[in-house]
Amino acid sequence: MSNLKKIEGGVTTPQGFTAGAVYTAIKKRENKKPDVAVLYSDLPCSCAACFTTNKFCAAPVILDREILKKGKARAVVINSGNANAATGKQGIEDARTVEREAEKLLGLGEDEVFVCSTGVIGQRLPVDKVLQGIREIIPAKLAKENGSEAAYAIMTTDTVRKECAYELQLSTGTVKIGAMAKGSGMIHPNMATMLVYVTTDAKADPADLQKMLSAAVDKSFNMCTVDGDTSTNDSIFLLANGASGVEIKTEEDKKAMADLVLAICTDMARRVASDGEGATHLIEVEAYG
């Protein structure tokens, strides 16, 4: 991949993406680090996602699986401090309330906003605080430069912010891809206790994106382990808004794009493993035969 270049940035580096984050005291912190974030695309996105294989998946995962069926979305709302897991029907209703409010504030239709939560399991989501957060963010705090704030907002036991970006020269132009992630404990295949958001300004079919993402996750996040636990909320999203005007159509470009998705997933998987709770070393094993 000689045309691949790592660049400064994160989830808002690709054209057309903005983000914002605020502190709402979902979990009280002395440093008042943000705990609610919104990631938004100016244009409709083709999307793909992979979710936890835990049979007791959290309410946001149940909701997001339904939204994903349309293959299109515009935004993601994320909160840390409360996982909205093991919360029954009420949890699903709460996630839906957050989704609908974000769609109203952004002027979107139904099922255009994914909702994600991470944090304490078994407690009801403090919906009022999440709603307060997204009302503060939309539209006042949505900005290109706030990608790093969003990356901070999704952290729980993480000790470092996790974000990166790449640029790829294709036959018809240049595309960018960015990512942010959280994860440091309960890390075990398949996937881990992680939330990962990958954005690109390439234009691509949802089915092609799903193939690329599933293959990349198998070779990256599904090979991570820290402590042997698989979580209830694991989710990774790939959003492509086409803002670059570069369409992924030829087999050559699809292969290059798939390699790009794998590169950024591998980068983020290493960052997650490196930040494992109590970890002092990162070990990679290559098996042959």
Where on the chain are the PLM-derived regions?
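N-terminal amphipathic/basic leader segments beginning at the initiator methionine
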Residues: 1-52
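Short beta-strand elements
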Residues: 36-42, 65-67, 77, 166-170, ...
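Short, well-ordered amphipathic alpha-helical segments that serve as non-catalytic structural scaffolds
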Residues: 56-67, 92-106, 210-223, 259-269
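Short, surface-exposed loop/turn segments at secondary-structure boundaries that line and modulate
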Residues: 76, 80-89, 111-132, 225-247, ...
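Glycine-rich, mobile lid/loop segments that gate access to catalytic sites or pores
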Residues: 96, 101-221, 231
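Carboxylate- and glycine-rich phosphate/diphosphate-binding segment that chelates Mg2+/Mn2+
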Residues: 202-260
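A glycine- and small/hydrophobic-rich beta-loop-beta segment
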Residues: 241-289
